[in-house]
Amino acid sequence: MDGMKLSFPPESPPLSVIVALSLSASPVTIDSSAAATTVPSFVFSDGRKLNGATVLLRYVGRSAKKLPDFYGNNAFDSSQIDEWVDYASVFSSGSEFENACGRVDKYLESSTFLVGHSLSIADVAIWSALAGTGQRWESLRKSKKYQSLVRWFNSILDEYSEVLNKVLATYVKKGSGKPVAAPKSKDSQQAVKGDGQDKGKPEVDLPEAEIGKVKLRFAPEPSGYLHIGHAKAALLNKYFAERYQGEVIVRFDDTNPAKESNEFVDNLVKDIGTLGIKYEKVTYTSDYFPELMDMAEKLMREGKAYVDDTPREQMQKERMDGIDSKCRNHSVEENLKLWKEMIAGSERGLQCCVRGKFNMQDPNKAMRDPVYYRCNPMSHHRIGDKYKIYPTYDFACPFVDSLEGITHALRSSEYHDRNAQYFKVLEDMGLRQVQLYEFSRLNLVFTLLSKRKLLWFVQTGLVDGWDDPRFPTVQGIVRRGLKIEALIQFILEQGASKNLNLMEWDKLWSINKRIIDPVCPRHTAVVAERRVLFTLTDGPDEPFVRMIPKHKKFEGAGEKATTFTKSIWLEEADASAISVGEEVTLMDWGNAIVKEITKDEEGRVTALSGVLNLQGSVKTTKLKLTWLPDTNELVNLTLTEFDYLITKKKLEDDDEVADFVNPNTKKETLALGDSNMRNLKCGDVIQLERKGYFRCDVPFVKSSKPIVLFSIPDGRAAK
């Protein structure tokens, strides 16, 4: 494609062609100054031309070197792609728009991509057609009307966010209902919505936000692993940064050496990466300790802060009762003298703290002289023993936000009463104000999000660690089998809502099921205990192997080798449900008729005998049974199910977690699995037929060591 130029009129850019060129990193010069009556065209260096958006799109599909399957890898796929490329034009017809959405939505219920198993120009054509309608699609996208279509659209946007957001910002005018080329003047390039009053602003979202000027921060304290509540804050920052073409920085709020460690820092960075968050840089509040100390001293000199040696319990009581501290009117000299004692970490200094001088009678108790600095002689995980004093979150956070150029600080609504304090601190410091934007904290039933309480479970040995699959940490839920795509969709569906409802887990697991079910391989397992041998008297004298799909609707899952033998294993529960003379269906084989049932003295089934009836109709049988061949190639499995760690839907602040510990949170069942499961890798997600979805936690090592599979909830039960 070297030396090629894309030419089109400024009022009608071929969005699908531009997207395809951008995704495939194809070298091309863009000229958006063609006459209004012309069609998009490729002009080659030798003077040859191709005309028309669909022709150009197909050319990109065929010639994209970095995406070899962009136009399919066989004639059938390429023909299907042609169908979708032609169909994309329907979305530009106002009367047919929703009918088209409905058709594609239904098709995507069982497909990840429109054609084949990877992104193609079929996806590009439909995706661009939707994106190009602007506000009409955005409104539907926020609704729950076309969930499969929205999932597909969002997954493509998430996967190629940097490229696609750039294209959308340049060529899609929100609210206009059609693509337009970006205006050439610098000022007008910021006008995304298109009317003069809303220049630089997308749809109502962050207050006073301008395209390209938004700077956000995600500021976790390194005192634990990232959990699902933190993930909501992190992903909302990511979402707004992408929406406004801004940036996110990660800042570790490392102001409490008693709780923090490098282990937590390392794992937080790992988890942020798992969430797919791209950040400009990593900073630490401790980077600003010298400046924070200077600011505290400045406020004392200006009479806006003082040193207080009131005992902590008395100080809390005075704050509740609105009583001024006896130290409130200390002279500047006395405050600075005690401040030096605090810096030195002396015995006298350890009795003191620094407080802001606000209003002790303010109805909002957060405004009653908040603490700015405390002594803490413990070693800091990053800077060692350099400091004996540390700023509080309430003092350090607004200072560093302003200093780092943060335009909008996202905070959960639990901080609402401290918003006025945040603004007052910045006012007293004489620093630039920062916009605060609230969202509701994520509350889930039977779930602890307090790092202190989670740490208690770790320290008592009730869980295996911070990545325990019963934990709500990112590492824990991923280990349980949750796909990050599901978590992102779940959180963004809630948006920045301030609703504080207690949520069930089943919605999240239902989203996860929609993602894994269309693609995960199918395997077979039989519970080992009391399994029953079913002898087929006319079965094969010699075992034979047949290759069958691991997923009947998804070729990409591959094939598995299934062995057929004269005797097969059934689970006791299945064997006990069969009557003599009953015809049953053996899945992936055919029908069989049970002729004889053997039971022990307690009435338990111990053996079955019967004959094959492969011509029998599977529609007429009541029982469709999973089975395994009687061979020594089967693998040992440990199937692990989990329950909630606590027995109360929501713990109150004064509840002791030890009083509500669930004593039975883990159930292990030994089973046998088909031989193909030897190839499972840690993290693979599969479906065991008639049992559910599982994630491989420990893969096959040797015959004596079972493969460990973790059960993945599917949304039907809140587990």
UniProtKB/Swiss-Prot annotation:
It is found in: Cytoplasm, Cytosol. It catalyses: tRNA(Glu) + L-glutamate + ATP = L-glutamyl-tRNA(Glu) + AMP + diphosphate. A motif ('HIGH' region) lies at residues 220-230. L-glutamate binds at R217, F218, A219, Y393, D394, F395, A396, C397, R411. GO terms for cellular component: cytosol; plastid; protein-containing complex. GO terms for biological process: glutamyl-tRNA aminoacylation; post-embryonic development; reproductive structure development. The keyword S-adenosyl-L-methionine does not apply. ATP binds at S93, H227, E414, L448, L449, S450, K451, R452. Interacts with GLN2, COL4 and RPP13L4/ZAR1. Catalyzes the attachment of glutamate to tRNA(Glu) in a two-step reaction: glutamate is first activated by ATP to form Glu-AMP and then transferred to the acceptor end of tRNA(Glu). Belongs to the class-I aminoacyl-tRNA synthetase family. Glutamate--tRNA ligase type 2 subfamily. This is Glutamate--tRNA ligase, cytoplasmic.
